Amino acid sequence: MELDNSHLVLGLGATGLSVVRYLCRQGITPLVMDSRDQPPGAEQLALEFPEVNLITGGFDCRYLVQASQIVISPGIAIDTPEIRAAIDMDIEVIGDVELFARAIKDRSPCVIGITGSNGKSTVTTLVGEMAKAAGLNYAVGGNIGIPVLDLLQKPVDLYILELSSFQLETTHSLNCISATCLNISEDHMDRYSDLEAYRQAKLALYDQSKRALFNREDSLTQPNDPMNQNSFGLTSPVNDEWGVKDGKIVHGTTEIASLQDVAIVGSHNHANLIAAMALAYHAGIDKEPMIQVAKNFTGLAHRCELVANIAAVAYVNDSKATNVGATVAALEGLGEHLGDIILIVGGDGKGADFTPLETVFNKVAHLITLGKDGDKIAALKEHSHKADSMADAVKQAAELATAGDIVLLSPACASLDMYKNFMARGDDFRQLAQALSVETLDSEASADV
């Protein structure tokens, strides 16, 4: 193979495939490299683009140093030695979102950008539902669902994008109508040097937006520099802010909806809803579609999702809580619950500091830990229970719970030490919880014979 490839795609998977599709539509045949021996998407690449070469098992520097542009997948750290060497040689290193931004650069602002440690998918979906209710021609994607470059294959008027810190590291020219950073808490500390480095990766989105929407109850989300900005929160708003007053969601002095009519549960989700309303407002969506969605949207799978109710015990799947902040938010959101909370927590902590959990463990009657970093979390609360598996954790929780209690899976950790992803973890919890009802019915049937 001749060493003449000017465009490299590093990392295959769904994002890498979308980059290849886009470049090939532009008449560019890239070279693809992946550090894995058998990367996901390899068969699809060969089927769709037999002319595109794939090198696996590492990044060959001979190709990197001759490239004019390298497009990296979000999972590849920009400080990977081979990538850093290319950057030091002034070779352009970008991501798929930056390619997307350049593709739409001649259009009027048509993007809503959403980042934050937690709640991104919920807010992105909510804004999408509001756009749908308003009859807009829209598309939702990015870190949720469809890769951004695949969204370009159909003409739309509004793009609603969930954006991770990894994606924002390589994005510089996204021209948003409005953008938000919902919250900041420790996450991906195995990739970032400290919380501030992670925060700055998130806040880079504000510099690429006409308006910044920050969380006034989380000072870490405030823009670094003065700009066209507004805020949201659960407190009473001032001037043009979004918030809550007398049990009602309000924009300034304008009432939008009563919290009593909102379908989604938990104070953290009410904050997510308010953020979505503010973003939708700046996209020209009026009050009625917001109200319609607020009354009907009950939440996403694996996010404080009620999966079973057995013997008056609620089993709630919050497997998407892959960091400490998400679990803190879940426990605070359920803070008004009258029964006990039995919490199942643990997994791969990604180098995070677990001590903030101590502040909310007073809301937890029984703590059950599992996974790689379960013991570190167990040390934060006396008389915790250790589980060897999810099945063991659910069994222990069922034995501890009484009528009116909640069994909450909110791990505060990634799932990769035990599962393929957080969805698989949540599905396992759901199946185990729902199986309890089958066992109960079987035992009752036997007793009646």
From Swiss-Prot:
<dbReference type="GO" id="GO:0008360">
    <property type="term" value="P:regulation of cell shape"/>
</dbReference>
<dbReference type="InterPro" id="IPR004101">
    <property type="entry name" value="Mur_ligase_C"/>
</dbReference>
<keyword id="KW-0131">Cell cycle</keyword>
<dbReference type="Pfam" id="PF08245">
    <property type="entry name" value="Mur_ligase_M"/>
</dbReference>
<comment type="pathway">
    <text>Cell wall biogenesis; peptidoglycan biosynthesis.</text>
</comment>
<dbReference type="GO" id="GO:0009252">
    <property type="term" value="P:peptidoglycan biosynthetic process"/>
</dbReference>
<dbReference type="GO" id="GO:0005524">
    <property type="term" value="F:ATP binding"/>
</dbReference>
<dbReference type="GO" id="GO:0071555">
    <property type="term" value="P:cell wall organization"/>
</dbReference>
<keyword id="KW-0963">Cytoplasm</keyword>
<keyword id="KW-0547">Nucleotide-binding</keyword>
<keyword id="KW-0961">Cell wall biogenesis/degradation</keyword>
<dbReference type="Pfam" id="PF02875">
    <property type="entry name" value="Mur_ligase_C"/>
</dbReference>
<dbReference type="GO" id="GO:0008764">
    <property type="term" value="F:UDP-N-acetylmuramoylalanine-D-glutamate ligase activity"/>
</dbReference>
<dbReference type="GO" id="GO:0051301">
    <property type="term" value="P:cell division"/>
</dbReference>
<protein>
    <recommendedName>
        <fullName>UDP-N-acetylmuramoylalanine--D-glutamate ligase</fullName>
        <ecNumber>6.3.2.9</ecNumber>
    </recommendedName>
</protein>
<dbReference type="InterPro" id="IPR036615">
    <property type="entry name" value="Mur_ligase_C_dom_sf"/>
</dbReference>
<keyword id="KW-0132">Cell division</keyword>
<keyword id="KW-0067">ATP-binding</keyword>
<dbReference type="InterPro" id="IPR013221">
    <property type="entry name" value="Mur_ligase_cen"/>
</dbReference>
<dbReference type="Pfam" id="PF21799">
    <property type="entry name" value="MurD-like_N"/>
</dbReference>
<keyword id="KW-0436">Ligase</keyword>
<dbReference type="GO" id="GO:0005737">
    <property type="term" value="C:cytoplasm"/>
</dbReference>
<keyword id="KW-0573">Peptidoglycan synthesis</keyword>
<dbReference type="InterPro" id="IPR036565">
    <property type="entry name" value="Mur-like_cat_sf"/>
</dbReference>
<keyword id="KW-0133">Cell shape</keyword>
<comment type="similarity">
    <text>Belongs to the MurCDEF family.</text>
</comment>
<feature type="binding site">
    <location>
        <begin position="116"/>
        <end position="122"/>
    </location>
    <ligand>
        <name>ATP</name>
    </ligand>
</feature>
<dbReference type="InterPro" id="IPR005762">
    <property type="entry name" value="MurD"/>
</dbReference>
<comment type="function">
    <text>Cell wall formation. Catalyzes the addition of glutamate to the nucleotide precursor UDP-N-acetylmuramoyl-L-alanine (UMA).</text>
</comment>
